[in-house]
A protein has these predicted regions:
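Contiguous, well-folded functional domains in the mature portion of proteins
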Residues: 1-292
Length: 292
């Protein structure tokens, strides 16, 4: 078990715990502010943040590809903080499990999981009810996932910020759900537990052979300049294909399934009951086919 080092924890505590900060929260969580801050991360001056960030959070750059600047020192190879933020793994650094009865992790992230969404399912950090209708913004697809399994993958600013398709299949539908840009780290969730259903998000409805239909929901967060889609959704996707990435800021991917089709892995379910997230590498087992 590890204790998380939170990037910008002082600012987040001020915004969500301080009465004056709470007055400013709606402004800070607005799309223009997040986009403006995201633009700053594209400027060349922002590259100066990379070395101290790497040192503070003990990031092992040997497992990542270098940036676009030719230099012997990898931490100086990124032309901006955003280029560093969306760094890619070296080839073959992560592999996706091949067993068709096991779902691989679609993000390198911290996971919560529930066997089924119902009136008793709450976010462990502060008892906020979750349901498919709210998560999907009242979409026509909401009923497809009622009573089905749920995975929440939370990405921290220190993490790999590209997200992938867990399984081969096709996209049936995709749509944007407008909202705000609150932080998704634990400090913010404790103060404002409804963040997952008020933040801006993008949903894709996927059809897979082994695990049925999936709702793949990317949740925007404070200071996320953009959520970039990398795959042409009119074409088929394969297990492990990159779906997209988040520019600067921690964020979250939520996965919903059809009732009885699959269940989160036992360790995730057990840890979730105790309010503990399970950290997984990209491609590790995250769920099993069938009802367990």
């Amino acid at each position: 078990m590890e204790t998380e080092l939170v990037y910008g924890d002082g600012a987040i505590k001020f915004i969500y715990d301080n009465p004056f900060g709470q007055l400013l929260a709606p402004i800070i969580a607005s799309k223009p502010i997040s986009q403006l801050y995201g633009c700053y991360q594209d400027w060349s001056i922002s590259k100066n943040k990379v070395p101290p960030f790497v040192e503070k959070f003990s990031i092992d750059l040997s497992i990542y590809k270098a940036g676009s600047v030719s230099t012997e020192n990898k931490e100086n190879s990124y032309k901006s903080f955003n280029e560093f933020f969306i760094r890619e793994f070296e080839n073959n650094e992560r592999t996706f499990i091949e067993d068709n009865d096991r779902m691989p992790a679609f993000c390198e992230a911290r996971y919560f999981g529930h066997h089924e969404i119902n009136d008793n399912v709450k976010i462990p950090v502060k008892g906020k009810l979750l349901n498919s209708k709210d998560l999907l913004g009242g979409s026509k697809w909401s009923s497809t996932f009622e009573g089905g399994p749920l995975l929440v993958a939370r990405l921290c600013p220190v993490d790999y910020h590209r997200y992938h398709y867990p399984l081969s299949g096709r996209t049936l539908d995709s749509f944007q759900i407008k909202g705000q840009y609150h932080s998704v780290n634990p400090l913010a969730l404790k103060s404002k537990p409804e963040i997952f259903i008020v933040n801006e998000r993008r949903a894709s409805i996927l059809e897979t052979e082994e695990f049925g239909k999936l709702a793949y929901i990317e949740v925007g967060a404070a200071m996320v300049g953009k959520i970039i889609q990398r795959h042409d959704e009119s074409t088929l996707h394969r297990k492990g294909d990159e779906k997209g990435y988040f520019l600067f800021g921690g964020s979250t991917v939520i996965l919903l399934g059809e009732k009885g089709k699959w269940s989160p892995s036992a360790d995730i379910l057990s840890n979730t009951k105790n309010g503990i997230e399970t950290y997984l590498h990209l491609g590790d087992e995250v769920a099993l086919r069938g009802s367990h």
